[in-house]
């Protein structure tokens, strides 16, 4: 009985914690740099296994390289609130692009390389790619814009 009570309490606390993530912790969202041509935006959630695999690779690539005209951002979908996700996308100037990409089904665990002038998703990076492939995808996207 105690085991059932403990499991139920843990599940409820976890669910409540995910539903009430404050905006300040929900996303790393700032406007892209003025000279940015490409926005590399990670669709992320703390419960997403693909995110946990991809995020450290993206961070390592960011730290090891300088990409002219590329701004990195993360939109956190941990709370599973589409309204909050799309509000953060609007802050980045890519609300329309994200709505066209996802519709009602937001997918996490991918880095979207978006041309800020056209709103086009140039390329998508996923967890299967190593750091060299991620670097190449970002470099190629920057060269196209």
Predicted region positions:
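Short, internal strand/loop/helix patches
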Residues: 86-117
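Sec-dependent signal peptide recognition
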Residues: 1-7
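Typically the conserved alpha-helix immediately C-terminal to a functionally engaged Cys/Sec
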Residues: 52-66
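Thiol-based oxidoreductase modules, predominantly thioredoxin-like and allied folds used
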Residues: 67-91
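Non-catalytic, surface beta->alpha helical segment in thiol-disulfide oxidoreductase systems
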Residues: 105-145
């Amino acid at each position: 009985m105690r085991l059932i009570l403990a499991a139920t309490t843990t599940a409820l606390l976890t669910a409540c914690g995910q539903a009430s993530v404050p905006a300040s912790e929900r996303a790393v969202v700032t406007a892209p740099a003025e000279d940015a041509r490409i926005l590399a935006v990670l669709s992320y959630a703390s419960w997403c296994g693909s995110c946990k695999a991809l995020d450290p690779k993206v961070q390592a690539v960011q730290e090891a390289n300088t990409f002219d005209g590329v701004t990195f951002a993360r939109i956190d979908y941990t709370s599973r609130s589409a309204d909050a996700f799309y509000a953060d996308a609007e802050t980045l100037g890519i609300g329309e692009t994200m709505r066209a990409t996802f519709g009602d089904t937001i997918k996490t665990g991918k880095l979207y390389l978006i041309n800020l002038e056209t709103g086009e998703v140039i390329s998508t990076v996923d967890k299967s790619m190593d750091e060299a492939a991620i670097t190449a995808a970002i470099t190629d996207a920057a060269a196209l814009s």
